[in-house]
A protein has these predicted regions:
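Proteolytic processing hotspots in large secreted/extracellular or virion-associated proteins
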Residues: 1-4, 9
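Surface-exposed charge patches
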Residues: 6, 57, 115, 184
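Feature responds to low-complexity, polar/acidic, surface-exposed segments characteristic
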Residues: 10-20, 28-54, 61, 66-113, ...
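Aromatic sugar-binding surface patches on proteins
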Residues: 23
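Alpha-helical membrane segments in multi-pass integral membrane proteins
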Residues: 176-188
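Short, hydrophobic-biased amphipathic alpha-helical segments
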Residues: 207-214
Length: 226
């Protein structure tokens, strides 16, 4: 699962959504460029025996997921708003979109990807004009970002039986109105699951390992990976 189509961008490879069938790669990419089939295995010492090993290594091989330091992924650390936005942006291969919006509290390694994600309609800032990149992302906001990403990729996001789907979560009344449609869609699509307690836990956080599982399911739902 470490082989994928990649696009040569400058002097580095970026993920090109692609599926393989009997040795043939079908690439879903918005635009032209130089593409190659690349085997790029990645491993992290602290996921060797972790349940997320395949998801983490699969996304890392495509330069979507990334460690916190060389060889260290920290799967049980909570994922931040910046980290999740960057993973979605790279997963959809939209790193070349022109990002022109700069949040006053966004700078550093994730600045370009976050600006790109905003321009693509995947993320929004808060009312005060900030993004709060280092905050732990809430599960309800992950659902909103995922649906925005699916919409960007061409999916029509509608849920006819929203109340019926949400009723399966015992805490469904605590899901904010702005996120209810997104939570229902992600649950129905099997992209974001509820907790073992039958809660959705909308204000709860997710680990970096859980984030890779969600991104991987999103990519399979879009038929962007095998």
């Amino acid at each position: 699962y470490s082989t994928s189509a990649m696009k040569l961008t400058g002097d580095e490879f970026t993920f090109a959504p692609s599926v393989f069938d009997h040795g043939t790669a079908r690439i879903h990419y918005r635009g032209n460029g130089v593409f190659a089939i690349v085997n790029n295995p990645k491993s992290f010492s602290n996921v060797a025996n972790h349940w997320s090993k395949m998801n983490v290594e699969k996304l890392a091989a495509r330069n979507i997921a990334f460690g916190k330091s060389e060889g260290i992924f920290a799967p049980d650390d909570y994922v931040t708003r910046a980290e999740f936005a960057v993973m979605i942006t790279r997963a959809l291969a939209i790193t070349e979109e022109e990002g022109t919006v700069n949040f006053e509290d966004v700078s550093g390694w994730y600045e370009k990807d976050i600006s790109t994600a905003y321009s693509a309609g995947i993320i929004n800032g808060r009312d005060d004009g900030k993004f709060y990149p280092n905050e732990r992302i809430k599960r309800k906001d992950m659902a909103v970002m995922i649906c925005n990403a699916l919409r960007f990729a061409g999916k029509e996001i509608t849920v006819e039986n929203e109340q019926e789907i949400l009723a399966k979560f015992v805490d469904n009344s605590t899901i904010d109105e702005y996120a209810r449609g997104s939570v229902a869609y992600c649950a129905k699509a099997g992209i974001i699951m509820g907790r073992d307690t039958k809660d959705f836990d909308p204000d709860g956080n997710a680990t970096r390992a859980e984030a890779t599982a969600i991104i991987e399911r999103m990519l399979r739902y879009l038929d962007f990976i095998n």
